[in-house]
């Protein structure tokens, strides 16, 4: 089946159960797709419940630690808050999102030439009323190793899942159409801005190469929240460390989810298919005697 990009820019939407190969083709062509019902209403409610006390703290301006000089936090507008360490804070993130079948089907297809992959970070992004337009940017790291143009392999993908509805009024994410292909940094008549309005539970699956940014939240009382799950190949260092998560918590996770947060080894592809992130040249979890929920996948 062929997915054709419409003449008028429009983000393709895929219902639950859609063919991952078709989704991946549209992703490669357009740089962004919408995965409808990525999380169920019950999962959305559970994440929102788990995050409620943490959101109350950041919305109140209460910070436990002062940011380091190079912290991402120093770049955020006062209205835009982030809660990181979801693997430590959210059971739904650990058990459901990190094991999401479609997320893994798509990640495997994108990063097949690199071998395994893991999470770059897991966070909730919370945008209060009055949050200004976010500057347009690419997520893929700007270092020369990765910033080599549209024909380079994908080095970064993101699953941005709405915890509330995204509308033009409350600041839905906007994308510069075709910017992942033509390597431009701002919109023009051939690369218009396309706004992604989605329902809670839908996920924006997009390339690290596409230029995008959140929009102005022009409401008086609506917070716009989402779970951001960026994924990178295992040859890249994650943004977030997870060594602080209690072992007893990690051992409630599947081996696949454990690998996603760096508690298991990853594997490089053929012809040099050896493990990486190892202990004594062998699988990290096995060497540590790490227990898990289920069995280690090959």
From Swiss-Prot:
<comment type="function">
    <text>Fe(II)/2-oxoglutarate-dependent dioxygenase; part of the gene cluster that mediates the biosynthesis of novofumigatonin, a heavily oxygenated meroterpenoid containing a unique orthoester moiety. The first step of the pathway is the synthesis of 3,5-dimethylorsellinic acid (DMOA) by the polyketide synthase nvfA via condensation of one acetyl-CoA starter unit with 3 malonyl-CoA units and 2 methylations. DMOA is then converted to farnesyl-DMOA by the farnesyltransferase nvfB.</text>
</comment>
<keyword id="KW-0223">Dioxygenase</keyword>
<dbReference type="GO" id="GO:0046872">
    <property type="term" value="F:metal ion binding"/>
</dbReference>
<feature type="binding site">
    <location>
        <position position="212"/>
    </location>
    <ligand>
        <name>Fe cation</name>
    </ligand>
</feature>
<dbReference type="GO" id="GO:0016491">
    <property type="term" value="F:oxidoreductase activity"/>
</dbReference>
<comment type="pathway">
    <text>Secondary metabolite biosynthesis; terpenoid biosynthesis.</text>
</comment>
<dbReference type="InterPro" id="IPR008775">
    <property type="entry name" value="Phytyl_CoA_dOase-like"/>
</dbReference>
<keyword id="KW-0408">Iron</keyword>
<comment type="subunit">
    <text>Homodimer.</text>
</comment>
<feature type="binding site">
    <location>
        <position position="137"/>
    </location>
    <ligand>
        <name>Fe cation</name>
    </ligand>
</feature>
<feature type="binding site">
    <location>
        <position position="139"/>
    </location>
    <ligand>
        <name>Fe cation</name>
    </ligand>
</feature>
<dbReference type="Pfam" id="PF05721">
    <property type="entry name" value="PhyH"/>
</dbReference>
<dbReference type="GO" id="GO:0140782">
    <property type="term" value="P:novofumigatonin biosynthetic process"/>
</dbReference>
<keyword id="KW-0479">Metal-binding</keyword>
<comment type="similarity">
    <text>Belongs to the PhyH family.</text>
</comment>
<keyword id="KW-0560">Oxidoreductase</keyword>
<protein>
    <recommendedName>
        <fullName>Fe(II)/2-oxoglutarate-dependent dioxygenase nvfF</fullName>
        <ecNumber>1.14.11.-</ecNumber>
    </recommendedName>
</protein>
<dbReference type="GO" id="GO:0051213">
    <property type="term" value="F:dioxygenase activity"/>
</dbReference>
């Amino acid at each position: 089946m062929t997915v054709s990009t419409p003449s008028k820019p429009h983000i393709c939407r895929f219902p639950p159960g859609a063919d991952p190969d078709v989704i991946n083709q549209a992703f490669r062509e357009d740089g962004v797709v919408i995965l409808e019902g990525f999380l169920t209403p019950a999962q959305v409610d559970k994440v929102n419940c788990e995050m409620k006390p943490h959101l109350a703290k950041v919305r109140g301006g209460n910070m436990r630690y002062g940011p380091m000089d190079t912290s991402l936090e120093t770049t955020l507008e006062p209205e835009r808050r982030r809660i990181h360490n979801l693997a430590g804070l959210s059971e739904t993130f650990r058990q459901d999102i990190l094991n999401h079948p479609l997320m893994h089907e798509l990640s495997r297809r994108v990063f097949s030439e690199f071998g395994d992959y893991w999470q770059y970070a897991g966070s909730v992004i919370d945008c209060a009323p009055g949050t200004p337009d976010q500057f347009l940017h690419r997520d893929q790291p700007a270092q020369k190793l990765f910033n080599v143009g549209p024909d380079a392999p994908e080095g970064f993908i993101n699953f941005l899942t709405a915890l509330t509805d995204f509308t033009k009024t409350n600041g839905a994410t906007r994308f510069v159409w075709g910017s992942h292909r033509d390597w431009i940094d701002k919109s023009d008549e051939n690369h218009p801005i396309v706004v992604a309005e989605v329902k809670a539970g839908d996920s924006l699956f997009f390339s690290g190469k596409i230029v995008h940014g959140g929009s102005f939240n022009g409401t008086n009382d609506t917070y716009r929240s989402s779970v951001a799950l960026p994924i990178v190949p295992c040859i890249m260092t994650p943004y977030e460390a997870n060594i602080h998560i209690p072992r007893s918590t990690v051992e409630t996770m599947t081996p696949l989810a454990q690998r996603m947060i760096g508690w298991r080894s990853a594997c490089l592809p053929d012809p040099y298919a050896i493990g990486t992130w190892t202990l004594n040249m062998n699988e990290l979890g096995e060497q540590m005697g790490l227990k898990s929920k289920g069995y280690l996948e090959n």
